[in-house]
Amino acid sequence: MDFASLIERQRIRLLLALLFGACGTLAFSPYDVWPAAIISLMGLQALTFNRRPLQSAAIGFCWGFGLFGSGINWVYVSIATFGGMPGPVNIFLVVLLAAYLSLYTGLFAGVLSRLWPKTTWLRVAIATPALWQVTEFLRGWVLTGFPWLQFGYSQIDGPLKGLAPLMGVEAINFLLMMVSGLLALALVKRNWRPLVVAVVLFALPFPLRYIQWFTPQPEKTIQVSMVQGDIPQSLKWDEGQLLNTLKIYYNATAPLMGKSSLIIWPESAITDLEINQQPFLKALDGELRDKGSSLVTGIVDARLNKQNRYDTYNTIITLGKGAPYSYESADRYNKNHLVPFGEFVPLESILRPLAPFFDLPMSSFSRGPYIQPPLSANGIELTAAICYEIILAEQVRDNFRPDTDYLLTISNDAWFGKSIGPWQHFQMARMRALELARPLLRSTNNGITAVIGPQGEIQAMIPQFAREVLTTNVTPTTGLTPYARTGNWPLWVLTALFGFAAVLMSLRQRRK
């Protein structure tokens, strides 16, 4: 049996789809093999050529299952370690999540073959990127969204990175789909013309990486210190551990006062309600102000609402140089985009009694506003995002201000142990710095704590799973990238034009 007849078998295509999907995981950190993104997407498109809509949908689903099954299996670490459920149930939940996310790639492939069944330039160069943009938007929006493993992030060190400050990471997704589709067409049709067009399209954005959209402000360079406490997740919310945790962070911070202008503690570094820690916070605030330093820390806050109930927030507060700390101070940030099951539980009256996984510590948070003013610490303006929020490009951009000196993200990835999850999270954070041309300060409990430059480059970092302090000089920048000015609107206009053209041309072809 020759290869041509073998590849026509649907079962073979489904198996290959799984493999091509799994290959895509190599494009992301910590592997960082960016060509794997093109190979994976090329395989997806080639396998759906000359297939009926349901066959294509199955191929798209299997491809997605290969990608998400291999790329987000780190979720298993937190479920198995802290979920309190039998092993088979843990595996089932991870499989269920991967299968759910694969519905979107299945939808993409099925609709593509339904509306544009012919293997043509129209399908791969116009219809495919527009439809992919829509289905990826749905994946990042429905049920609060999970926009993880978008292939644009693979280009943070790749040839297309220069497109990010211009139109954002989603524009890189768009171009990767177009290029990979043309390569698939060239391979299947054995035609050099799509290959030439693909190479030209891929090369066009390369010079953009040499455009500097920002102006450094060396006169405002400061020393920043980020304390990585490395508190085990199993002990983090243990009441008996609270005093020891505060000692760890304070002892690491005391020598930095008067030396570092800005000191940063990670997400919920203070594992207690803010109102309970007023004596500690006020004493620390006074000491910081006396020595001319400021501190930014994660903490938990609970406020009485109009219904006479408490709203609990995942919060960032500032202490030190400037106005004295006050519990009523507006210089704070409350996390807006909460993670299901980790920070709130849907249908909690039903799910919480079922297993510890649905009743984790601090899983009843309330949302802060979508738009919040920047934090101000020691005269430094910080656009903040807590943990998962840093992967939400449009939300970070909407909170960004022209006078922002730095992007700030604090996180606690201890939930995911030594898996690849924290590295993928770190890669996405780097893209925010590139899109908005600002240095990014990333402070975490156990890694990856780092300073990212305004071009997405790693300027300084410390190892994971170590109780260390990262101290370095950081220079703020000024200036607005095109993406900072417009967000995703230009890409959505382009998507609408491509979609309209694809539908119109398809209708004309069917009438002939």
From Swiss-Prot:
Class of enzymatic activity (EC top level): transferase
Assigned protein family: Belongs to the CN hydrolase family. Apolipoprotein N-acyltransferase subfamily.
Domain CN hydrolase: 227-476
Signal sequence region: none
GO cellular component, one term: plasma membrane
Keyword Nucleus: no
Gene, per the UniProt record: lnt
Main location: membrane
Transmembrane annotation, as ranges: 14-34, 57-77, 91-111, 124-143, 168-188, 194-214, 487-507
Protein name per the record: Apolipoprotein N-acyltransferase
